[in-house]
Amino acid sequence: MKEPSKIDKVLPIVTVLTMAATGSEMDQFAVISKMDTNEKLGTSSWNMIPKTSICDPEYLYTLPSIQTAAGTADIMSHVFEEYFSKTTDAFVQDKFAEGLLQTCIKYCPIALKDPENYEARANLMWASSMALNGLCGSGKEGAWSCHPIEHELSAFYDITHGVGLAIVTPRWMRYILSENTVDKFVEYAINVWHMPVKEDKFALANEAIDATEKFFKDCGIPMTLEELNIDETYFDNMAKAAVSHGGLAYAYV
């Protein structure tokens, strides 16, 4: 992420939300892509929070289905990046997070089936705003591992950010699942997916990860890089850049 301290003056920002996804209507983040150099870098400043945001769910009625699904994956990824954290005493924040995840799981399929369902669009829009406005991550350590990885995918290839996140997220979850992290995945399984308690914690954790992947797939998101015609050509460059830009100081492993 580029040095945010250099952003000392910002013109007043007003947003009109046309997609529930990034949370720009209520957050301080920005991402800039430079396709000729394959760079996609983020930055942030509290000065960049919009002064006013117009959030009318009816503006989302005409979104293509893939953008509705990808936007939901982006919202969920924002929550995951802060929910899966080494910080263990943030009960309120985690309950916020679980509620937002349940909202996405409930309302994305409804919006896909009935694009003009006001309730579904309104709840997804509100989830977008709440996922990255600071509440879920307040007081928590987080590495934001998936976003730097996906930023490299969409820096080198013309893919939708949320699609890349949906592909990366379940694989990241399986990679980090360990004795140190399994209890959090058990919480996720029980509190978000309403799965019954099992004696085998790892079996329950993997069921929750499988449910996450299936949800994205059922929403119509391609779930492999092959489907997007992405091969291993740039993987080494991507990996180096992801670590350089994202860092591993608070990685949840």
Describe the residue ranges of each PLM region.
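A glycine/threonine-rich phosphate-anchoring loop and its flanking beta-alpha core
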Residues: K2-V92, D183, E187
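Short glycine/serine/threonine-biased micro-segments
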Residues: M19-A21, A69, L135, T160, ...
